[in-house]
Amino acid sequence: MKQLRLEPVVQVRGEINIPGSKSISNRALLLATLAQGTTTLTNLLDSDDIRHMLASLKQLGVNYRLSQNNTVCELDGIGGVISSASAQELFLGNAGTAMRPLCAALTLGQGEFTLTGEPRMEERPIGDLVDALRQLGANIVYLKNDGFPPLTINATGLNGGDVEIAGDLSSQFLTALLMVAPLAKGSVNIHVKGELVSKPYIDITIALMAQFGVNVINHDYARFEIVAGQRYISPGKVLVEGDASSASYFLAAGAIKGGEVKVTGVGRLSIQGDVKFADVLEKMGADIEWGDDYIIARGSPLTAVDLDMNHIPDAAMTIATAALFAKGTTVIRNIYNWRIKETDRLAAMATELRKVGAEVEEGNDYIKITPPAVINTAEIDTYNDHRMAMCFSMLAFADCGITINDPDCTSKTFPDYFKQFASLQG
């Protein structure tokens, strides 16, 4: 197994241009596919999850051209639904942002489509989405365990009508349903059961749909109306914002060991909720400065916070490791959906924080972290989870440094993360 040793870092300073957002990249690729016209996507993320989406689209007959560095994609929309005369089997790795939307999109046309993935994907739930699609007439069969991939879609189109979908596990299910609703055979009225998690991710979806000419009526996140007769029209160009979750590591670095760290590609005009991570750092005592498309974090003594972070679940992970450098006990609440991500992130985070000496209480949907008097060095397991690797890079700011096991797992969203991280040192 590959290991990366991060030696103690005394101070960080510098500027990082954040790679494109994973959430926006895969949503935009699918909408561009369903749209009429050619779309040029710039600052597209070049990572495993996006490659899985692109490979699947190519297999389904979608034509696109990638720049040499894979960050500009010119894609010819099919102007409607995806159909296939022959049975197709698509491998989607561990990319939830490809599996969920494609599962929904492939019900719209005609054909037989089988969706598979890595072993961890077979443990990540999709039942809430499938239940909703079945209410609109979709024929979807589980191939192993009910409620989980792999699955086969026998597509004949999607009916309009009223549909209920659970919102308390993952917002990706609602996102997938919203994106396909305009191409159903009638108007779609979506009722959300339970409290909707990660609302800002739904805002991203609706904003992108609007860019492609489709209007969603949002009734306070409890009901969504998509009127029949709409279609996606390419806006010509789509700029993919920097990934706000990826920005969180550099902002935390600035807060803990700044110096001054500036991230560009996200800022006050961002459509991503995860930029609110900077507000949490500010509550902890960091000096934060906002621009339209940048955020600056400067170092300052940090104190613990006790907050509901359901609205920023991915970026909240960075608070868990930043908490090791804050005075007092930090509590991160309402984060049950950490458990259904690339790994069970609540269990993984608790395990690895204890390795470095933290006192940790792991609840069903919260984590309580008290830093040790002295942080211990350790070998951090990353569970094939990109965010675990990036979060624990913060331990380079301890006097003893840290060792990261399987550092290349960052390829899911940020292949050159550790190179960029190293550029801030000195």
Curated annotation (Swiss-Prot):
GO annotations of cellular component type: cytoplasm
Protein name listed in UniProt: 3-phosphoshikimate 1-carboxyvinyltransferase
Location relative to the cell: Cytoplasm
InterPro entries noted in UniProt: Enolpyruvate_Tfrase_dom, Enolpyruvate_Tfrase_sf, EPSP_synthase, EPSP_synthase_CS, RNA3'P_cycl/enolpyr_Trfase_a/b
KW Transmembrane helix (keyword) present: no
Keywords: Amino-acid biosynthesis, Aromatic amino acid biosynthesis, Cytoplasm, Transferase
GO biological process, one term: amino acid biosynthetic process
Function in brief: Catalyzes the transfer of the enolpyruvyl moiety of phosphoenolpyruvate (PEP) to the 5-hydroxyl of shikimate-3-phosphate (S3P) to produce enolpyruvyl shikimate-3-phosphate and inorganic phosphate.
A Pfam family this chain is assigned to: EPSP_synthase
Binding-site positions, 3-phosphoshikimate: 22-23, 27, 170-172, 198, 314, 337, 341
CDD domains found in the cross-reference section: EPSP_synthase
SUPFAM superfamilies xref list: EPT/RTPC-like
Active site annotation, chain numbering: 314 (proton acceptor)
Family designation: Belongs to the EPSP synthase family.
EC number(s) on file: 2.5.1.19
PANTHER family registered for this protein in UniProt: AROM/DEHYDROQUINATE SYNTHASE, PENTAFUNCTIONAL AROM POLYPEPTIDE
